[in-house]
UniProtKB/Swiss-Prot annotation:
It comes from Neisseria gonorrhoeae (strain NCCP11945). Tetramer of two alpha and two beta chains. It holds the Pfam family PALP. Keywords: Amino-acid biosynthesis, Aromatic amino acid biosynthesis, Lyase, Pyridoxal phosphate, Tryptophan biosynthesis. This is Tryptophan synthase beta chain. GO terms for cellular component: cytoplasm. PROSITE patterns: TRP_SYNTHASE_BETA.
Length: 400
């Protein structure tokens, strides 16, 4: 796929994306777009971004050959891009550093964020502390219950965590509340969106901050094995870790790209979070147009995933576009497959992955045995699993 260019000047990736917000937010988004376009062309902005990624986040994150897991499965060699080793334990901080630098550049003193698994909330609270800003994090009440360690981490970092009791009490509702708050306090507040979704320019901006993942991986794989992987795979909720890995590979036609949605209890049940794989129609949510789980009246459907971070009814607009143009394959891993992959990575490699990332590992577990021993799968290990210990223990019937 040569000459890939997206989004267009209106923020559309094909027919997805755009700017579907109340009139009160248009000036704020235009201000943000202008500030980002200026920052994008300022070498000093990127120099500071790279400095913080190196000295504060600890980048580059390594690539690691999961040799024992590969041997156990028999087939393709599995390599992991270790985003779990970043400061705060996931890929989220790549984006929050970038957006916090932009907020400071715009003179904003307060940041707000939404969070599902709590990783983006922790990463936002972290950069707010780092740059001396106040921080409010909106989190669904159900997610607060399943992610208590991260809630406490956010509070330790000085953030105010606001529980959201409306709707499904998960990520979608947290995002609704954060957008409402942004409308009310747009003058002094910067909204750090945590995924490659939302109204333009967020999907492009988040991608640009996250593609450090794929850029590093390309150089590292070349050094490690003398070529690029046959397949690059990542889990997809809103899709920021996936677009960060995929974007630098889009024009590399010999690298197959696979996005793994949350299959929950199966896409033939209502209990999943897989808009593309389940064939969901296009809809509008949180200011952008994309494939969206909805009923015949356009009402957003409930979702289910064992991982809070994938529990979202929509998907970032660039992913919908990459599906439409057939550059990326989207598929699912079910809850039980993700849990099996979680166990395998713990036992064979001594790495406890996030349940989100376990969905990508599950694809490798399922497909590596069907591939040749000389083939290579690169899995984006987007986060570590400390936050999921309680969830996994509960599912195994273990009292902690």
């Amino acid at each position: 796929m040569k000459n890939y260019h997206a989004p267009d000047e209106k923020g559309f990736f094909g027919e997805h994306g755009g700017l579907y917000v109340s009139e009160t937010l248009i000036p704020a988004l235009k201000e943000l777009e202008q500030a980002y376009n200026e920052a994008k062309n300022d070498p000093e902005f990127w120099a500071e971004f790279r400095r913080d990624l190196k000295h504060y986040v600890g980048r580059p994150s390594p690539v690691y050959h999961a040799a024992r897991l590969s041997e156990h499965l028999g087939g393709a060699q599995i390599w992991l891009k270790r985003e779990d080793l970043n400061h705060t334990g996931a890929h989220k901080v790549n984006n929050t550093i970038g957006q916090a630098l932009l907020a400071r550049r715009m003179g904003k003193k307060r940041v707000i964020a939404e969070t599902g698994a709590g990783q983006h909330g922790v990463a936002s609270a972290t950069v707010a502390a780092r740059f001396g800003m106040t921080c409010d994090v909106y989190m669904g009440a159900d997610d607060i219950q399943r992610q208590m360690p991260n809630v406490f981490r956010m509070k330790l970092l000085g953030a105010n965590v606001i529980g959201v009791d409306s709707g499904s009490r998960t990520l979608k509702d947290a995002m609704n509340e954060a957008m409402r708050e942004w409308v009310a306090r747009v003058d002094d507040t910067f909204y750090i969106i945590g995924t490659a979704a939302g109204p333009a320019p967020y999907p492009e901006m988040v991608r640009d901050f996250q593609c450090v993942i794929g850029n590093e991986a390309k150089a590292q794989m070349q050094e490690a094995i003398g070529r690029q992987p046959d397949v690059a795979v990542a889990c997809v909720g809103g899709g920021s870790n996936a677009i960060g890995l995929f974007y630098p590979y889009i024009e590399e036609e010999n690298v197959r790209l696979v996005g793994v949605e949350a299959g929950g209890l199966g896409v033939d049940t209502p209990d999943h979070a897989a808009p593309i794989t389940s064939g969901a129609p296009i809809g509008v949510l949180h200011g952008f147009r994309s494939y969206l789980m909805q009923d015949e009246n356009g009402q957003v459907l409930g979702t289910h995933s064992v991982s809070a971070g994938l529990d979202y009814p929509g998907i970032g607009p660039e992913h919908s576009h990459l599906h439409d143009i057939k550059r990326v394959e989207y598929t699912v891993a079910k809850d039980d497959e993700a849990l099996e992959a979680f166990d395998l990575l713990c036992r064979f490699e001594g790495i406890i992955p996030a349940l989100e990332s376990s969905h990508a590992v599950a694809w490798a577990v399922k497909n590596a045995p069907k591939m040749g021993k000389d083939q290579v799968i690169l899995v984006n290990l987007s986060g570590r699993g400390d936050k999921d210990i309680n969830t996994v223990a509960k599912l195994k019937g273990i009292e902690l």
